[in-house]
Swiss-Prot record:
Protein's name in the database: Alanine--tRNA ligase
Iron found in the keyword field: no
Gene3D superfamilies hit by this protein: 2.40.30.130, 3.10.310.40, 3.30.54.20, 6.10.250.550, Bira Bifunctional Protein, Domain 2 (3.30.930.10), Threonyl-trna Synthetase, Chain A, domain 2 (3.30.980.10)
Entry's cofactor comment: Binds 1 zinc ion per subunit.
Enzyme Commission number(s) from the entry: 6.1.1.7
Organism of this sequence: Shewanella denitrificans (strain OS217 / ATCC BAA-1090 / DSM 15013)
Function description: Catalyzes the attachment of alanine to tRNA(Ala) in a two-step reaction: alanine is first activated by ATP to form Ala-AMP and then transferred to the acceptor end of tRNA(Ala). Also edits incorrectly charged Ser-tRNA(Ala) and Gly-tRNA(Ala) via its editing domain.
Pfam families per record: DHHA1, tRNA-synt_2c, tRNA_SAD
InterPro entries noted in UniProt: aa-tRNA-synth_II/BPL/LPL, Ala-tRNA-lgiase_IIc, Ala-tRNA-ligase_IIc_anticod-bd, Ala-tRNA-synth_IIc_core, Ala-tRNA-synth_IIc_N, Ala-tRNA_ligase, Ala_tRNA_ligase_euk/bac, DHHA1_dom
């Protein structure tokens, strides 16, 4: 009955729907209005504001199958993916949720009933864990459900602090939290591992399949646990794990989804060994990559786009290992859509974009992969130790586009590690290499050439009737499109705004009797407007009359951000200077991004002044006036033009009081007061002479203010002050720290002077030259430079080599007086010693520093230095 993951997903959603739960679609992998997350990584993410009491829904019970990615930041499974049975970059989290509705008894009963009655799992294979003091949960499991006491395992604070437990869930240091109960499945005694709470619990025999979180407390800043007035429930069950159980396999990579993706990958590349771990890596990575692109993330060198690029390139590298000689990764998308079933809805709509973006990235990487792998191979062959230096790893990243974890992946196969600290240091030195974010796939459909002309009628209304004048399927003109097909529909007139001037295209619906076309984007093709989307019902022919309806909510939120962009532009010119000109923008329902020419970072005081000026204009509640006029007349009136836009002789001018006047064909609010509130969220440089401001408006701005206030309150709690005193309290703390650091530095200098006086007497005479080679115990690495300077002053003409080991790292410094550098160079000396401790270094002839990781080799390395020096002094 549940031989496929798709059927299992449907059964889960259907079961909870019969129990009064609202089926909620998976949210995007890009978290909405949550700066704490890189990617959506749990089913509860989209309900976070509901649990926090900041949002309300029309339902109090929900169920979902949430797409999740864990491949960056705190939740980073990338290194283990493909090498273990259950690590993935992408997974689906099945979950049911109660927002102040049912609580422990119902949540426990729902889970047990689904597992034992719907899925018919044998109860003798199941055991549960509870928080150590949660007697209520114990009674429910034992008395109500009938689980034997020996199969209910109490887990205490096993992470070193109160409430720090595998069975106590916390959203953060403060806020909703509570005990949780986990259900485990026993895969059988033929697999090593022990029950939860035993020393063998990390084995693969007992696997957690369902976590039920009981949010019943609100943790205060002082640690106090106050009962929530309306306790809630958040549960999660990884679909891959339960699918493995239902399909009678132990590894997630043996379930239907992965079997088909692995088989297809092997077929495309021409591989017969289906157990090869590289096939697992590729099968996993196509899921995260395809769905990330479908949710709007594109490969780039920063943020989410960089994580995506890392995953794509790791998959391509494993394809190369398998013998792939041509692009292959994008060819897995159709198979992925097939195996994901209903969960692939968004992927179906964006399939063309996803495939083209994957192919473009693969082709770009393929051009450098072979050369980069050759360089890495040479570096590893020449390596004498077991650590690849950070400079080489950075060169691979900087020159060949190798993410450092891909380099680490190759090294791992030879039992070699990468000096990640050295890599980060090299990265910091060359940070100026940053480039603007990539835009793979953004313009693929704009390659269409359409001779038709569409009249825009969306300034005053969001609906209207129109005739279909052209249809396009896969870039080709057709006379008809039918249900299930992705198409571009061209109308003779439309209320849909096509992407232009930074404003995103409208979304909505085209319909008629028996026809439903979902518009997911609107683009310009010459004089025509193309409505991109999918035929959900019926068929559309050229000549069909359709009702066009723009998504009102998305349009209105976009208009808030577009109108405030004009105010922002004018405010920047007033505060910073008239040299400020727009270099680009993005205006969508969620936020606005404004790029402008400016020679330096905008000062905090200037940003505050700009924000206050914009909000003052919002409060003025100016009416927005539009007028069409000749472009020369508009310029005479002082209207500003948008970067990169082409204008006709007749232009549309948008005016807001006497504050802003711009050429603009976009849609706007009726009055500036409609914007409500404007908040700047970030300001940064994106290229030489170009700055970027990101901001939010309306409800999104209110949410941002609330979030900032919450953080301020938390900071006040940590400083044991009120919000108004945070700055003064923090300044006092910093002043105190600065004074302590000054005193510590002075003390170190005194200690170094004293130590150098003692050590100077240990210098040996080698061929008439004073040579001091010494290992120092318990010396801070930061003190080496001062100590070396003191010794050079005392010894006058001398060669000095000092080494110390701390926290698993070796630090070396060499000093040579100027009269001896012709024979012995400090850089060569320290490099020779560093090589023996798994490190690298260098410097000037008279002073050089180095580091290493092989602490155990330090004594022998220092001992070899005297011989090396003697040979050069002979």
């Amino acid at each position: 009955m549940f031989e496929t993951t798709a059927k299992l997903r449907s059964a889960f959603l259907a079961y909870f729907e019969t129990q009064g739960h609202q089926v909620v679609d998976s949210s995007s992998l890009v978290p909405h209005n949550d700066p704490t997350l890189l990617f959506t990584n749990a089913g509860m993410n989209q309900f976070k504001d509901v649990f926090l009491g900041m949002d309300k829904r029309s339902y109090s019970r929900a169920v979902s199958s949430q797409r999740c990615v864990r491949a960056g930041g705190k939740h980073n499974d990338l290194d283990n993916v493909g090498y273990t049975a259950r690590h993935h970059t992408f997974f689906e989290m099945l979950g049911n949720f109660s927002f102040g509705d049912y609580f422990k008894e119902e949540a426990i009963r729902f889970a047990w009933t689904f597992l034992t009655e719907t899925l018919k799992l044998p109860t003798e294979r199941l055991c549960v864990t509870i928080y150590e003091t949660d007697d209520e949960a114990f009674e429910l499991w034992n008395k109500k459900i009938g689980v034997a006491a020996e199969n209910i395992i109490r887990i205490g604070d096993n992470k070193g602090a109160p409430y720090a437990s595998d069975n106590f869930w916390q959203m953060g240091d403060t806020g909703p939290c509570g005990p949780c109960s986990e259900i485990f499945y026993d895969h059988g005694d033929h697999i090593w591992g022990g029950r939860p709470g035993t020393p063998e619990e990390d084995g693969d025999r007992f696997i957690e399949i369902w976590n039920i979180v009981f949010m019943q407390y609100n943790r205060q800043a002082d640690g106090a646990m106050l009962p929530l007035p309306k306790p809630s429930v958040d549960t999660g069950m990884g679909i891959e794990r339960i699918a493995a159980i239902m399909q009678g396999v132990h590894s997630n990579y043996e379930i239907d989804i992965f079997k088909q993706l692995i088989a297809k990958t092997a077929e495309i590349i021409g591989v017969s060994d289906l157990e090869n771990k590289s096939l697992r890596v590729i099968a996993d990575h196509i899921r995260s990559c395809a769905f990330l692109i479908a949710d709007g993330v594109m490969p780039s060198n920063e943020g989410r786009g960089y994580v995506l690029r890392r995953i794509i390139r790791r998959a391509v590298r494993h394809g190369n290992k398998l013998g792939a000689t041509d692009t292959f990764f994008y060819k897995l998308v159709p198979t992925l859509i097939s195996v994901m079933g209903d969960a692939a809805k968004g992927l179906v709509e964006t399939q063309v974009i996803v495939e083209k973006a994957l192919k473009a990235e693969e082709e770009q990487f393929a051009r450098t992969l072979e050369r980069g792998l050759g360089l890495l191979d040479n570096a590893l062959n020449e390596l004498s130790g077991k650590v690849l230096d950070g400079d080489t790893a950075f060169k691979l990243y900087d020159t060949y586009g190798f993410p450092v974890d891909l380099t680490a992946d190759v090294c791992r196969e030879r039992d070699i590690t990468v000096d990640e600290a050295g890599f980060e240091a090299a990265m910091a030195e060359q940070r100026s290499r940053a480039q603007a974010a990539g835009n793979f796939g953004a313009d693929y459909n704009k390659q269409l050439i359409i001779d038709e002309e569409t009249q825009f009628c969306g300034y005053k209304g969001l609906s209207g009737e129109a005739n279909v004048v052209a249809l396009y399927l896969d870039g080709q003109a057709v006379n008809e499109v039918t249900q299930g097909q992705d198409a571009v529909v061209v109308l003779n007139n439309t209320p849909f705004y096509a992407e232009s001037g930074g404003q995103v295209g409208d979304k909505g619906v085209l319909s008629a009797q028996g026809i439903n076309f979902s518009v997911t984007d609107t683009q310009k093709f010459g004089q025509a407007t193309g409505h991109q989307g999918k035929v959900l019902e019926g068929s559309i022919k050229v000549g069909t009359k359709l009702a066009a309806e723009v998504n009102k909510d998305l349009r209105q939120r976009t208009e808030l951000n577009h109108s405030v962009t004009h105010l922002l532009h004018a405010a920047l010119r007033q505060v910073i200077g008239t040299h400020v000109t727009q270099k680009g923008s993005l205006v969508n329902p969620e936020r606005l991004r404004f790029d402008f020419a400016h020679f330096e970072g905008v000062k905090a005081a200037e940003l505050k002044q700009v924000e206050e000026l914009v909000n003052a204009q919002i409060r003025c509640n100016h009416e927005l006036n539009t007028a069409e006029m000749a472009i020369d007349e508009a310029k005479e009136k002082g209207a500003m033009a948008l970067f990169g836009e082409k204008y006709d002789e007749k232009v549309r001018v948008v005016t807001m009081g006497d504050f802003s006047i711009e050429l603009c064909g976009g849609t706007h609010v009726g009055r500036t007061g409609d914007i409500g509130l404007f908040k700047i969220t970030s300001e940064a440089g994106i290229a030489a002479g170009v700055r970027r401001i990101e901001a939010v408006t309306g409800a999104a701005a209110m949410a941002y203010v609330a979030e900032q206030q919450a953080m301020l309150d938390e900071a006040a709690g940590l400083l044991k002050s009120d919000s108004a005193s945070v700055v003064a309290k923090l300044k006092a703390q910093l002043d105190k720290t600065k004074q302590l650091e000054k005193e510590l530095s002075q003390l170190k200098d005194k200690l170094a002077a004293a130590a150098s006086a003692d050590m100077a007497g240990d210098a040996q005479d080698i061929n008439g030259v004073k040579v001091l080679v010494k290992k120092l115990e318990g010396v801070d690495p930061g003190s080496l430079r001062g100590l070396q300077d003191e010794l050079k002053q005392k010894l006058k003409s001398a060669i000095i080599l000092l080494g110390t080991a701390k926290d698993g790292k070796v630090n070396l410094i060499a000093g040579v007086s100027n009269d001896l550098t012709a024979k012995v160079k400090a850089g060569e000396l320290v490099a020779m010693v560093a090589q023996q401790v798994g490190g690298k270094g260098g410097g000037r002839p008279d002073m050089a520093q180095a580091g290493g990781t092989q602490v155990e080799n330090l004594d022998a390395a220092l001992a070899s230095a005297s011989t090396w020096i003697a040979e050069r002094l002979a």
